[in-house]
């Protein structure tokens, strides 16, 4: 079941973020940061367990970023990430200040399958790059 994250989900969200951030596939987010931004997270819950996460970041020139998308590896290839991306697009476009949804990702095939197009990051506003300063790959970005 896909739903809005609750404060009680913060630790489960961080656990998935830590799993993916260990090998540089996702930016680390502290538990405090997650709690402060819990309203921006959506989770996929199965049998009472958070097995998927996604975060939307609003705010740059009518752009919305899908970020911190991750699914517990035990549940890969079941369409959960696809559902979460489709839900994120829907949520983002409900906001009248949004006309473009983007993502910086290694999961290129997933997003192309869902209609996203590859663009050069240079076309994104400089403000988008703030998170890049925390990334392990900032000097050799391959997203």
Name what the model sees in each region.
Residues 1-28, 45:
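Short amphipathic alpha-helix that is part of the acyltransferase structural core
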Residues 93-94, 112:
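Non-catalytic positions within long, well-ordered alpha-helices that form the structural scaffold/packing
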